[in-house]
Each structure stands twice: as structure tokens, then as C-alpha cells.
Amino acid sequence: MTRAVRIHQLKIAPKYFNAVVAGQKTAELRKDDRGYKVGDVLSLCEWKHGVFTGREWAAVISHVLPVNDVMAVSEQWVMLSIRPLTPLEALGYVIAGGAV
């Protein structure tokens, strides 16, 4: 049985947001407080000076690396490998239940 695609809405600073949109940023370091899984979608919402700019972009998680696997840290962090999706691709991905 397949699981439903989870969508995680996250705040992101403009310089990182722009790098994701341009395809230059393909990983995201995050505290693992949401149980991120391969196939989940990140809804990246650009925030500047504490205010949502209205810009949003999606990316699908292609790999989850627990940071504790490579270094000892006191909290649970993960390095998420991501593949940016256009808004239309993101919609199709979610509707298809994560099928590529």
C-alpha cells in the first residue's frame, strides 16, 4: 500500500529561495521535527524581514541523510536532497500520489 504524499510548508530566505528556483541549490538542512521521507514535497515559502513575500516554490525530497550518520550532534537534523518542481509539476505529482 502506498502512502499519501505529505506536503511540508517551510519558510526560506530569499537568497536560498532564488537558488532553489534556479536549480543551483539541491539540498536543504533541516531539523527533523516533521519526519521527512523520500517522496514528500517541500512547499518553500519565501520570507524576507519576517514577512511572507508571496513567492512559493515546490521541491520533492529524493534522499534523506540523518546528520548523526556523519557527525555527532545533540539534536536530530537531516540533509534533504531535493528536486525542484514547477507549480504545474508539483500539482501533478501530488495528484498522482507521488508517481513520477
Curated annotation (Swiss-Prot):
Keywords: Transposable element
Signal sequence extent: none
Pfam families linked to this entry: DUF3850
Family of this protein: To phage P2 uncharacterized 12.9 kDa protein in gpA 3'region.
Protein name (database record): Protein ORFd in retron Ec67
InterPro entries: DUF3850 (IPR039440), PUA-like_sf (IPR015947)
